[in-house]
């Protein structure tokens, strides 16, 4: 791993200081810069524009070289607003790509695309930095073993297990619990795997970024009293930022995650919210650079850009980066080039259902819509596979019977179907689980359920051994022993009430 001992905003050596250019043209966030003959910067080099605008305000804009136009001109995309820039202003070639701080100093802090802290908590230790443009790990470095990434969340581990070093798509509308699920995963990886997380907010609402930060502080994922004990680093490039920043903020977050994997040899969770905005920003930049648009107006380099990000997210022999990416589907059209290109890279999908959230079943993961390439007998074992398939079959049969129940009632069903419905309702409730990060809101302690316990619990429900227990005993409990204990308590309470 290459580590450049530079600071977060590119520092210029005296030798490179002579490599100065001048702004020739400004088109919104795109700058054309003229350099002396033979002094052309490389593609992806960071350029810095420093000076004062017409009212004397200090300007410090970092850009990234995207095209070499000929005639000693380069075209660069700005990473921040270009307000106040003028033709003829001096531009410094830093001689290297953007570099951002990496390592333990990033935990508990919020950064922008340039790796500058934006949380007003003072400077960050920038002795260890890394360039945001790196090649994906070589084939020989990859860890090709297929292994399950245990999350401690029953519905995920049983029905749509995550792959260590894999990529998971998180689908769900507003208010169905995406943020809480993300925070629980951050908490569980820190406790069970001793790992850390990096959250990349790509082109989403600033309010949502602020809410997430506040909720993380409240739930202890970010430790305010001792920042070093925090479990997550946050990198934001929100909706109000120029397209250059939104296009590169995912790479900044990924670079921080790669350091934890390659140098600290840890398991890392990388969250990207939202991967669609990364594509959208790339589309804007592509149009600004004058490229001919491709299908549905997207950039012609769509799959290349997506591949260069996704291929760096993988397991190596040192550690793993497991990525969970929120996917916005424009107009609910899964054939749109942006989500369609994303699907090609995903190992699992976790679909959150508004119907389940309305019933109060959290996490509101849809057991029938969520999928995983890992759910195969040769990977998870026959016992796990059989249990998962039977849970899905029972849930599917209940779904088919719901219309009949709504019209005719339960009494009109056959004995076998009534038994199926009773078990399916127990399964539905047993798929709910109290979260550690929700303790502050619910008052009930969180539960981490191991995979073996999860399988045992569902086998007992499917076998009919627990048919005599009331279904409310299975709601918001950890393992199956807690459900039987809760059933006994309910029985005692009902006797006392009589």
Curated annotation (Swiss-Prot):
InterPro entries, per database record: AAA+_ATPase, ATP-synt_VA_C, ATP_synth_F1_bsu, ATPase_a/bsu_AS, ATPase_alpha/beta_chains, ATPase_F1/V1/A1_a/bsu_N, ATPase_F1/V1/A1_a/bsu_N_sf, ATPase_F1/V1/A1_a/bsu_nucl-bd
Listed HAMAP family: ATP_synth_beta_bact
GO MF assignments: ATP binding; ATP hydrolysis activity; proton-transporting ATP synthase activity, rotational mechanism
Family: Belongs to the ATPase alpha/beta chains family.
Biological process according to GO: proton motive force-driven mitochondrial ATP synthesis
Free-text function comment from the UniProt entry: Produces ATP from ADP in the presence of a proton gradient across the membrane. The catalytic sites are hosted primarily by the beta subunits.
Membrane topology: Peripheral membrane protein
Subcellular location: Plastid, Chloroplast thylakoid membrane
Positions with a binding annotation for ATP: 172-179
Cited Pfam families: ATP-synt_ab, ATP-synt_ab_N, ATP-synt_VA_C
Keywords: ATP synthesis, ATP-binding, CF(1), Chloroplast, Hydrogen ion transport, Ion transport, Membrane, Nucleotide-binding, Plastid, Thylakoid, Translocase, Transport
Catalytic activity: ATP + H2O + 4 H(+)(in) = ADP + phosphate + 5 H(+)(out)
Entry-linked SUPFAM superfamilies: C-terminal domain of alpha and beta subunits of F1 ATP synthase, N-terminal domain of alpha and beta subunits of F1 ATP synthase, P-loop containing nucleoside triphosphate hydrolases
EC number: 7.1.2.2
Protein name: ATP synthase subunit beta, chloroplastic
Quaternary context: F-type ATPases have 2 components, CF(1) - the catalytic core - and CF(0) - the membrane proton channel. CF(1) has five subunits: alpha(3), beta(3), gamma(1), delta(1), epsilon(1). CF(0) has four main subunits: a(1), b(1), b'(1) and c(9-12).
